[in-house]
Every structure is written in structure tokens, then in C-alpha cells.
Amino acid sequence: MFSNNNRISTRQVFRLFVFDFVGESTLILPSQLAAFAGNDGLASIVLGGIMGSLYLWYLAYVLKKMETDLVTYMERILPAWMKKILLVLLLVYFTGMAGYGAYIFSDVIQKGLIAGESFPLILILVLLTAGYAVCGGIESRARVYEILFVVLFVLLAVMLLIAAGDLEMEYLYGFFQADTGSVMKGSLAVFFCLMPLFLLAFFPSYVQKAKWGKLVHAVHAAMWFAIGVLADRKSV
């Protein structure tokens, strides 16, 4: 049984953020890490995860001070005109991120699944699907991800086990063979893919206040789960 109360559980939060972290990053990070750090990509992944942990700690500290979600806090302390400007900036930011993600997924679909199909048509269908999901709200999205999580990650585990025979062990021992600047570029690329952490600022309104601490722990666990998936992908 599901309840329609505009609330989601911390378990659903964990699964939501895992999909947000893993979805796009597994498509773009392998090539970026290979270009930036070569065999040292694993070090970049770990450093990017540490940067993400520090950023999450800062977000948790700010949310504790605000005692509410970001939008409600802006309504409380800012004049209406300034709040509207910030909301427009947030809209531009999220539109840009969503557009980039839609472009990446459409490109992968065209090249890997239906080669020769019109790219604009694929992109339009991806955007329509995303728009339909947004209209369903966060609670509907959480329900879908809760169902898909086990199925998709069991399949992922099976694929990784099959690929274990192609494991390149030297990737696991390449720490800091590349120069520090290259490793840092790779870690910044990883940190960029962890930017969905910022969404934590909007989640307090969907989780009971008594569970805010568990909310942060769920997001942190999701981030390191995704880091583990990325590290495994880098080693294969």
C-alpha cells in the first residue's frame, strides 16, 4: 500500500539519489577520467567522493540552521523580488543540467540502441518522458525508483561479475602516477557529477523533521554507493 501524503521515506531518498548519481556519471565519467588521469582515475574518484562528503556536511549544517527547505527559507527572509530572481537562477541551473542529461542520454540511445534514428525525435521523446515524470511529483518518482532499484542493480551486479574476467588490476595500483594537477582535474569531474547533492536543500519538506538526520545519512550512503559503482566501472 502507498500513501499519498507528499512524503517519502529515507529508503526512497537513498534510491532516488543513487539513480541521480549513477545515471549520467557512468556515461560521461569513464572517458573524462581516462583523458584527465589515465590509470590514476581511481584516485580521482576517491578524492571526488571526499569533496562530495565535505560539501554534503556543509549542506547539512546550513539546513540545520535554516530549519526548513531552501524555498521556504527564501520566502521567510528575502523580499519578493529577490526571491523571484533566485528562483529564476535556480530554474536556469536545473534546466541546463536537465538539458545536458537529456542530450547525453539521447546520444547514447541513438548510437547504442537505434542507430540511424532521428536525434531530434529521440531527444523530444526523452524530454516528454521526463516532463511526464515531473508532473507525477517526487512521491511518484520515489515509488518507481524503489521498484526499479533492486531489479536494475541486480542486473548491474550480474554484468559486473561477467566482466570480472576483463578486470585490469593495474588500474587499482595506479595511485598518483599521473601529476597532481591531472588527478585534481579528474576529481573535479567526479565532484561535478555529484552536484545532485544540492537537491538535499529541497528535501526537508518531503521528510518528517525527526528524520532529517537520517535523510543526510541516506544521501551520504547513496553518494558512496555510487562512488563504489564508478570505481568498479573504472577497474573493468
Whereabouts are the PLM-identified features?
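Membrane-water interface regions at transmembrane-helix termini and the short interhelical loops
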Residues: 35, 107-110, 128-148, 205-211
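Membrane helical hairpin/interfacial module
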Residues: 22, 26-119
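Hydrophobic alpha-helical segments and their helix-loop junctions in multi-pass secondary transporters
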Residues: 95-98, 102, 151-176, 234
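Transmembrane helix-loop junctions in multipass membrane proteins, especially transporters and channels
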Residues: 60-69, 164-172, 210, 235
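Small-residue-rich segments of transmembrane alpha-helices in multi-pass membrane proteins
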Residues: 77-89, 148-163, 222-230
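Hydrophobic, membrane-embedded alpha-helices of multi-pass small-molecule transporters
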Residues: 10-28, 44, 48, 52-55, ...
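Short, Lys/Arg-rich, polar N-terminal cytosolic tail immediately upstream
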Residues: 1-8
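Perimembrane loop-to-helix junctions flanking transmembrane segments
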Residues: 71-78, 173-182
